[in-house]
Amino acid sequence: MFLIQEIIRKKRDGKTLSEEEIRFFINGIRDNTVSEGQIAALAMTIYFHDMSMDERVALTLAMRDSGTVLNWKSLNLNGPLVDKHSTGGVGDVTSLMLGPMVAACGGYVPMISGRGLGHTGGTLDKLEAIPGLDIFPNDDHFRRIIQQVGVAIIGQTSSLAPADKRFYATRDITATVDSIPLITASILAKKLAEGLDALVMDVKVGSGAFMPTYELSEQLAQAIVGVANNAGCRTSALLTDMNQVLASSAGNALEVREAVRFLTGESRNPRLYDVTMALCGEMLLAGGLASSADDAHSRLQAVLDNGKAADVFGRMVAAQRGPGDFVEHYDRYLPVATLSKPVFATREGVVTAMDTRALGMAVVSLGGGRRQASDTIDYSVGLDSMISLGERVDAQRPLAVIHANTEAQWQQAANEVRAAIQLGDTAPEKTPMVYRRVSAEA
């Protein structure tokens, strides 16, 4: 038995907390025996004093164990349980292709996703643009979909890492969100509760990234990889570019449309293709489903070319109570905004830089995202036909096409898009889509 204030005092004085002390505190968050003030105090001491690797692992596992940890043994699955987590960005629709692609290659992907907040889109919001789709199936239904289809993308239920929900809500109002040990534990508690064999992290870098600098993104990737591997889950991370919108579109229904077109081969944005293939390749390697990066690439290309990945996506949508013919007739089902017209730059030039965060907020202004967690979303609005860095804009080539439901919304978004995109005379130096790989070995 410990005194909560003594645990806080110990960390306040820069000492190392034991696994038992951390677990006692986290269980107190779950059981409501720890007050919001005490959570805030510990969060601030961790913010200033950091945590050792042992403390970070103990915090992550205590938060994971505060609720249900999924166990798949009884299903006798004939492949690895693998997942991916992204730190979030704009036009980051990779999950919708990646899950089916990996499942088509023999993996099982029990993906528990989140909603969008601020400039970053949420995978759950994208899926909810599909009429009837159930993102909260019960446990038996979730397990059945994984067993029969190989992938399901669902929301976090109250039984998964419940201590994290309360801890995060307090961090959010006490300026302690951006603490690497706390971010690491928050992300991994939920992911490790999925009962995974392997995890791949997509840590974004650039003007639309969660972390403001490359160095901080790198630190976060290293922290997550270190803690997850020490907690018993084989994990690697890719640092990927978010200095421009990743896909050709940003907005819920628009991104779902792009995902289906990607899977069927109708249209594939090269940047989105590079990042999706890199992440899927990591997942196949981590799960022992490919012998090398080249082998992974050819297996993934095969399931795109032969239609297996698109078929798995369609089966997942149907299994989650969406339309049975969604892949064939997505345009029949996805909501469409009443107004769709291009926004042009005020002068000709080459795109030299983008404020990707501001472009994400333009989607929020249209009603396609949330400023607060309680906001409702208009799934039909957003941007598509996005210009890319290095491309020339003129009277023929717009910056984007804006999908809005009122002229006033369109006008506001047009102003925000113009302000977010810088023009010059020469193209910027091309940056890689994947900056580096972080693994336990390196």
Curated annotation (Swiss-Prot):
PROSITE patterns: THYMID_PHOSPHORYLASE. Keywords: Glycosyltransferase, Transferase. The gene is deoA. It comes from Pectobacterium atrosepticum (strain SCRI 1043 / ATCC BAA-672). Its EC number is 2.4.2.4. Pathway: Pyrimidine metabolism; dTMP biosynthesis via salvage pathway; dTMP from thymine: step 1/2. Belongs to the thymidine/pyrimidine-nucleoside phosphorylase family. GO terms for cellular component: cytosol. GO terms for biological process: pyrimidine nucleobase metabolic process; thymidine metabolic process. Pfam families: Glycos_trans_3N, Glycos_transf_3, PYNP_C. It catalyses: thymidine + phosphate = 2-deoxy-alpha-D-ribose 1-phosphate + thymine. One of its GO terms (molecular function) is 1,4-alpha-oligoglucan phosphorylase activity. This is Thymidine phosphorylase. HAMAP family: Thymid_phosp (MF_01628). It is an enzyme of class 2 (transferase). Homodimer. The enzymes which catalyze the reversible phosphorolysis of pyrimidine nucleosides are involved in the degradation of these compounds and in their utilization as carbon and energy sources, or in the rescue of pyrimidine bases for nucleotide synthesis.
